[in-house]
Amino acid sequence: MLRKGSCKPGSWGSFWAILALVGLVTRAAQRADVGGEAAGTAINHSHMLLQRLQDLLRQGNASDVILRVQAVGTDEVRAFHTHRLLLGLHSELFRELLSNQSEVMLRESRDCAAVFDKFIRYLYCGELTVLLAQAIPLHRLATKYRVASLQRGVADYMRAHLAGGVGPAVGWYHYAVSTGDEALRESCLQFLAWNLSAVAGSAEWGAVSPELLAQLLQRSDLVLQDELELFHALEAWLGRARPPPTVAERALRAIRYPMIPPAQLFQLQARSAALARHGPAVADLLLQAYQFHAASPLHYAKFFHVNGSAFLPRNYLAPAWGAPWVINNPARDDRSTSFQTQLGPSGHDAGRRITWNVLFSPRWLPVSLRPVYADAAGTALPAARPEDGRPRLVVTPASSGGDAAGVSFQKTVLVGARHQGRLLVRHAYSFHQSSEEAGDFLAHADLQRRNSEYLVENALHLHLIVKPVYHTLIRTPS
């Protein structure tokens, strides 16, 4: 065991010399072992090295630095007998901190102190096991001590495990904002948008900040039952958070009232505590919604613009906007189905429906990959294998007519994944308005594999949504 105290000027050089000598001896031994064999044969004993490093950390042999970690607000102190060389290899901050002292007191928050042993283990072995609740404190430690590889690793873990539960997504979003991690912030925001119904029904909904709420309310890709569900979720948030009146009124004005049927609007005006308190702030929007429902969209568009966000549906799961489709054994063969949606959200079109036909093909081959004949004898070039194809989904109207004048249809397909008994949205694919299919639909999915992330009990869970998009009429001179 080395003595505690300031490191000697030659200690780093001696340590590196020892490592270099070990490397030369190991290399010579490997050459001797493979003396008569072909060049390039490798012997990999890296797992033995990892085991030695674990033993070194656990036993504290030849340690030259003691880290004492105290949890803030407690008297609890944990001591770690470590080696400045190994700590300094990963962290420039540790290299500076330990350059002239052999014992350091570190003060960390309670959650960071609780995982400090995992953090130190990573510096020795380059690996650790992470739980959801440990992600933020580990990322904080990696950021504080400038361990870039662990920062990236934990951030990747958080993005990959957002579907592990709606609770972490809210906390992780706020953490990403505080640290400036834009990639993690956007991943959390996307997960929350796609699974808003689950988020709004959880205890974490009250922890949503006004800034996050504003970000969500302005999005058109929110997945929820209907706009009325969003209003009730907002009203519940207002009751818990009790924000200033300006924040509450701004949030209430983000609701898309034309997407709510008139009968439900009447009930909201009569029973909603939020509208009773802030009704004057949204009176113009309610009047706009009633006017929209009272006239045909074509007539309304002659006097008002209908291409604003208030007239654009979100991703509603209600039957009027689409239908679920569960495809068992999706890799087996082609499937087809049909469903109906309402012509538009206007009350004037409440009884008018459009029928849509859907075709799913698990192994569709583009023309460029299909077998062709190249010579006069009719000899075929090698045919493309079935696995060379990609999944394809085509959505077409059963008939066309004048009912859709002034409106186009935006199609969206949601792909669900089950986690801990819940079905969450894992992916969403949007079609171009002029297209009948999404070009990248399940482009990287392996439907042959039963444990594919896209499958739930060997079934593909889709939800097909068709959103009418209104266009402002172009007036022509008479």
Curated annotation (Swiss-Prot):
InterPro entries: BACK, BTB-POZ/Galectin-3-binding, BTB/POZ_dom, SKP1/BTB/POZ_sf, TRAF_BTBD17. SUPFAM superfamilies: POZ domain (SSF54695). Pfam families: BACK, BTB, TRAF_BTBD17. This is BTB/POZ domain-containing protein 17. GO terms for cellular component: extracellular region. It comes from the Eukaryota. Residues 63-132 form the BTB domain. It comes from Mus musculus (Mouse).
